[in-house]
Amino acid sequence: MSKDFLLEIGLEEMPAKYVTSSVLQLEKRVTDWLKDNQIEFKEIKTYSTPRRLTVLVEEMAEEQANRVEEAKGPAKKIALDDEGNWSKAALGFAKSQKVAPEDLTFREIKGVEYIYIKKEVIGEKTTALLPSLEKVVTSMTFPVSMHWGSNDLRYIRPIKWLIAMFGEEIIPFEITGVSTSNTSRGHRFLGKTATINQPSDYPHALLEQFVVVNASERKQAIVEQLRELETMENWQIREDDDLLEEVTNLVEYPTVLAGNFEKEYLELPEEVLITTMKEHQRYFPVFSQEGELLPHFVTVRNGNHENLDTVARGNEKVLRARLSDADFFYQEDLKITIDEAVAKLQNIVFHEKLGTLTEKMERVQKVALMLADYLNWQEEDKQDIIRLTNIYKFDLVTNIVGEFPELQGLMGEKYALLQGEKPAIATAIREHYLPSSAEGVLPQTDLGSLIAIADKLETLIGFFCVNIVPTGSADPFGLRRSAFGAMRIIQANGWDIPMLEVISRIVDMERAEGATELPSADVKKEVQTFLKNRLRVILQGHHIRHDIIDAVIGGDPNVIPQLIDRAQILNKHADAEWFRPTIEALTRVVKISKKYEDGVEVDPNLFENEYEQELFDKLEKLKYDYAGLTIVDRLKAFADLRTTIDGYFDNTLVMTDNDELKNNRLALLFELASFIKEFAQMDEINVK
C-alpha cells in the first residue's frame, strides 16, 4: 500500500536566483532520506515560488519492506572459551544484535572464521519515520542565510509555515516555533489560505489562491504572453534565458505588461539602455522586426490583469528615473578625454600588493610586446599595442561603468571610437575582457586576443608572486578563469607561444617590480603546475582519454596548440592495430635511456651490427626532418621506427659488460628518447 506525501516549506520572499537551486537541493535531500530509510516511492515532483519550496512524493510506501540483515562479529578464537562455550565477547555481540546465542553461526573470510548472524528486520511504519524529515529541512544550506527571532537556525529566509502530509494525515514536527499543518498560503495580495486535503490537491488548491506552484508552468505562461504581445504589437522580444529564469522566480502569478519611455533616450548607447532595463529593472527590451531598439519595454507583474495601466505607469516612472540618471552619467563622460581618464587610474589600487591600475597596465604592456616578438609582429602592430596598453582600462573611471560595471570594455570601445581611436584599438579594449566565462565568446581580432592573453597572464602570475593563489573552491580574483581563458585564446589562434619561457620572463619582471614574497623558482613551478591543471580541463573538454592527457602533459607542455594537437592525434589512433606495439617500443627506448650518463656522444665507429647503424641512420633523418613535420607526420615517423627499434633490441645487448659499447648504445637511445619524450610521456599511455 502507498500514499502521496507533501512537504512544503513556506518562507519570506527568497532571492530569485536561489529558488531553483534550493528546491533541487530539497529534492535531493528528500530522495536520499527515502533511500537511506529504504522507503519505496514512484516519483518526486518539485514545486517552487519565491515564497515556497515543495516536494510531492507520489506513491510512497506505507511501511518499510521487511529485510534480512547480516552482521559480522568477533573471530572464532575470541568467540569461544577453552571449553568451547560462548565467550563474553560472543554473548555481548548477540545481545547487541538482539538475537539469541543459538542463532550465531561461523563464516570463513580469508582463512579466518568469524561469528555471523542473519536476522529478519521488520519494516517500520512510514508515519513513524517521517517526523525525522525535520532534520532534512533544517540541514539545508544556502549561499546566503540569516538568523531571525531568538532561534539558532540559519536559513535562506525566515520559515513562516510548514506542511507535512502523508495522505490525509499531518506529520507532526516543529521548526523555529512553526508547526506542520495542512494549510498553505496563497498569493500575498490576491489569495487567502489554502487547505490541502490530499497531497495531490496541492497544485490546484494553490492555483485557486493565485499561485502557480509549478515553475515550468509559470515560465511557459510568461513565454506565451510574450509571444502574444509580440504578435499583437509587431515587436521582437528576444529570448533571454537568464532573465526569463529570474522573472519566473520573482512572481507567483505572472502577468505580462508593456510600458513606454521617451524616444530621446534612444540616443544613449544601446548597451546602456538594455542594461538599465534588464539588470536593474528586470524588463525585457523591445525591438522592431528590423532589430532596432524601440522606446518600449515589457515586464512581468506578480498579479492578475487588474489595474494594468496603473502598474505600467508606475514602472515607466521608475525606468524614466533610471534612464535620466544614465543620460546624465553619459553626458558627463563625454566631457572628459581618454588621457584625462587614464590619469585618474594612477589613483586606483589594483591590489595593495600589486600596485595601481597604471602600474598594472605598464606591466601588461611589457608582456604584450614580449608576446608580439614571439609572434613576429611588425613595428606598426607594436605601436598599436603601446597605444592600447596605455589606455585600455580608462573606462573604469567613467560614470557609466561606475553605475553599470558589467559594461566595462563595452563603454571603453564606444568612448574610444567617439574620440577617434583606431577601430582595432577600440575593439581590443572591449575584447580584452573575453572570454567572460568558461564557454564564453573569445576575442575575434588578433590585437584583442593578444591583449587579453597578456592581461590574464600578468594578473595570474602577479598574484602567484605575492602568494595569493586559489585554494579549494575559493578563487576571489578569478585566477582559474584567467588561466583557462588565456589558454583557450592561444589554442583558438594556434599561436606557438613558448609558455614555459613566457612564464619565466613574467615572473622575473614581476619580481623586479617588487612582487617578491616567494622564491622565483617556486613561483615558476607553481604557475606551471596550475596551468597544466587548466590544460587538463581543456583536454577533458575535447574528450581525450585520461592516460593520454597525462602523457602529453608529461611531455612538452610548452606550446599549447601543439600539445592539444598531440593529444587529439594520439586519442584518434589509440585503437589502431599499430598503436600498441609502437607505444611499447617507444616506451622501451625511454626507460632504458634513463641509464644514460651525461656527456657521452654517439660514435658510429663503435657499432657492431647493422641494427645499430639502421637505428642511427633513421634517427639522423628524424632529426633533420622533425621541425618541419606536422604532428600527424611525427607520430607516423615514430610508428615507422617501431620495426627498427624491435630489431635493434632483438639483436643488440645494450647493457653489455663493455662500458664503451654500453655508453655508446645508451647515448643513441637517449637521443631518440629526447624526441619521444617531447611528443609525449609514452609510458603513461595504457595499451594493455
From Swiss-Prot:
InterPro entries: DALR_anticod-bd, Gly-tRNA-synth_bsu, Gly-tRNA-synth_heterodimer. Its EC number is 6.1.1.14. Transmembrane segments: none annotated. One of its GO terms (cellular component) is cytosol. It catalyses: tRNA(Gly) + glycine + ATP = glycyl-tRNA(Gly) + AMP + diphosphate. GO terms for molecular function: arginine-tRNA ligase activity; ATP binding; glycine-tRNA ligase activity. The keyword Metal-binding does not apply. Tetramer of two alpha and two beta subunits. This is Glycine--tRNA ligase beta subunit. The gene is glyS.
